[in-house]
Amino acid sequence: MLQKTTSRTSSWRSAFLGLAALGLSAGAAQAQTAYGITADLLGDYRLVTFQLTAPGTFTATVPITGITTGQRVVGIDTRPNTGQLFALGYNAGATTNNAQLYTLATTGVLTPVGSPVTLALGTDFTRIGFDFNPTVDRIRVTAGNRANFRLNPVTGGIAATDGNLTYATADPNAAQTPGVGSSAYTNSYIGSTATTLYNIDEAFSRLVTQIPPNDGTLNTVGPLGVSTNSNLQIADLDIYFNPTTGQNAAYMSLSTASPTFTVSNQLYTINLASGVATAAGTLGSATNVTFIDLAVAIERPASLPAITGQLVYGLGGTNLITFDSANPSLIRAAVGITGVDATQTLVGLDVRPATNSLYALGYNATAQTATVYTINAATGAARAINATPVALALGTGSIGFDFNPTVDRIRVVGANRANFRLNPVDGTVAATDGQLTYAAGDANAANTPSVGAAAYTNSVATATATQLFVYDEARNVLALQNPPNEGTLNTLGTTGLTATAARDVDMDIYTAGVTNTAYLVANAATNGNSTLYTLNTSNGATTPVGTIGNGSAIRDIAVAGAAGVTGVRRAELATNLALYPNPVRGIASVSFGLPRAARVTMTVTDALGRTVDTVDAGLRNAGPQVVKWDSKGRAAGTYFLNLRFDNQPAGTRQAVVTE
């Protein structure tokens, strides 16, 4: 394989040697923007912009600057969480510290993210796949030498080294050695909770899926119908999620050099069901540059609008997602939750009224044990309240989790009729209460309840009275649990919903003054995506507010005020952390105490979580330190200066830039 890829690269070099890039004319813009990387072998790399419906007209062409000497840009993609363009630089001739993650501005300026890493991607820089997994905010990197990595877009480091790319044992092409050079995920939008990874096996001109992605298992979809395996060809794949239609559309760029040193750059659409490629137009008008990589833009607002209604926190996959109660289609943020026991799944989420902090319940259904966590709403970091999981027989079904505001205890109920109280201070079981049972004489007295959600009224620290409402998923009815400790259920009415088999249903009640507003989230749609509803606690009737995001399966919610929760943060590693001046005009100084010698970096992000700058302060000695950031050229607004010691979060300060 090594000899083949080296030969392929040499052929590509020979075909383009001596060619210079031409200036490209601009054209009219249209709905969906895409980006590409073009290059010649004189070392000129350019970022081009075009519309998918008019690929022949590049609306912008700018040189790429800032790449480390010896590296080539081998991949670009848009980060779904922020809409930022990222790029991977790779030096095929180096064996260590040969790769660097960058953000790529539309001006063509590359900004390093973290430090260089070592990626064994082989010697063929034309066969490297690079794409964001939208469900976990990690970057998949694949290569023609069967390499399979994940990168962290926050630190630039290697998140995991995964299994080599190999066809599944039962696949019709199981005996073949793949030559993957392009990768792309479906459902590329913030808040995505389901995705599929597709690759182009360029060695055999076919579309494949990579399932499971981390195992590197390839599954044949079908032939492209066009060749991608010539030594004089370079292909790339990206998949655009259309928020209007709710559909995924796959695009492939294919650059082919001729023996006469002219280049044909073609855009194709790809049928994800069959693999068939259909020509969609020429890419640009130049015939002496090659189109290396393709990335469809993902639109995120330049600044988020004011919250409408309340701020809702939701558990979607392994992420903490936030959205507005009056506008759930706008996902404000999605952060990965870290620090949870690997044997547990988060099954409950609520705001503790006494502290305005976010709490969650981690549960191991096999061991029937649980841990109470606090969740940092800004970073997703979970901190265990009880160091050792407690025995909690909640079965294998759905679980309800909510704070009783009058006694500062957590009510935990299960579809198996379990009924517990937990102490939020130490995570212990405060009481094992009566099994959930419909009251004698109730309309459902003959039925066995299957409760999967619970919520108390008057969720404020000063509450002296409250009521507990629960949701029976088997009958889709709302019930009052009264008395709560006896587990007696009293039917109030049907919701008119039918949850899917996954039964991702939860409810929460927000209190403002003397008014309680109940919300319910359910995946009643046939596609499994969740919808937010308001809930009438008198009769169980639901009124849809809207679909959450572009389509997310949300299993738990917690409703907070518009300002959000206070959060429970880990102690900062940096002592005496301070920012001055603030507001900032020009140079901002961050002073802190360093407890031990460490490499210090500072990442600057905007209000949308986009990385706008990285300051590498180098190795610093223990003691007082200062790191400076120049805000010149940054738009006025809110920024977050995030310190890291030896790549570990050390503290954050918020800055307001005035110009």
PLM features: residue spans?
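Sec/Tat signal peptide C-region and signal peptidase I cleavage site
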Residues: 26-31
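Short coil/turn segments that connect the beta-strands within blades of beta-propeller domains
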Residues: 32, 83, 135-137, 194-195, ...
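Structural motif
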Residues: 42-49, 94-103, 147-151, 205-211, ...
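Beta-propeller fold detector
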Residues: 58-68, 108-119, 158-171, 209-227, ...
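Repeated scaffold domains used in trafficking and secretory/extracellular systems
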Residues: 69-77, 118-132, 168-188, 229-239, ...
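Residue-level detector of functionally pivotal "anchor" positions at catalytic/ligand-binding pockets or at interdomain
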Residues: 562-580, 593-595, 612
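Short, glycine-anchored, charge-dense loop/turn motifs used at functional sites
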Residues: 604-612, 639
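C-terminal tail/sorting-segment detector
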Residues: 614, 627-628, 633-659
